[in-house]
Amino acid sequence: IITMSLTKNPNVLKWVEEMTALTKPDKVVWIDGSKEQIDALKAEAISTGEMIELNQEKLPGCLYHRTLPNDVARVEDRTFICCKNKEDAGPTNNWMDPDEMKAMLTPMYDGAMKGRTMYVIPYSMGPIGSPLAKVGVEVTDSIYVVLNMNIMTRMGKQAFENLGDESNDFVRGLHSKADVDPEKRYIVQFPEDNAIWSINSAYGGNVLLGKKCFALRIASYQGKNEGWMAEHMLILGVKKPDGEVKYI
């Protein structure tokens, strides 16, 4: 079952088709970013027990999500920058030849989404319409990822407005929880392919691919080529009960 795609861009459609053939989900759902779709996904997550609805009087709109005890942090020793030249990965990163890494990981993804739904998440890092914004598409088998990407990015069909119907300039993010096996957990960046692969984790820092993976690692490579610098930071807005907002 495949819901209607949100773009005519052949590069996006071809890649999603390839990832679907590899991971073999039962269903493919394109995320349009609408409130109706997000509310439905929240309800589904609550009904399956993946998330717990907290006291809505004290914490309105808040859901509680837990990962497995072996999956509660980023894994630096399993995080790789895979570019052709080892020196380009930088002195503080792990490196492996891109072809060797893909040969190792591809069998892990084969059929990893059987019995599950693949969510196709278009998103923009930066305001829609901004010449500085960068577009990504993440495919995942996690509702948690969808709901958090909705918070952390400009998620939904409007992201394709920045990309257009012909451009190939988007970051391809492939994520599957698979078996959440810590011995087969990898978070891999392929800068020269504009791609990120994450497998066997459900923890935010490893699976929200617009975060560290794109905004810091892939963006550093993009910035090097395009003459800008990637700055990884947080702007926090704190809202008082009277409605005043202070930004930190």
Protein language model features and the residues they cover:
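Conserved internal helical-beta-strand scaffold that buttresses enzyme catalytic cores
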Residues: 2-247
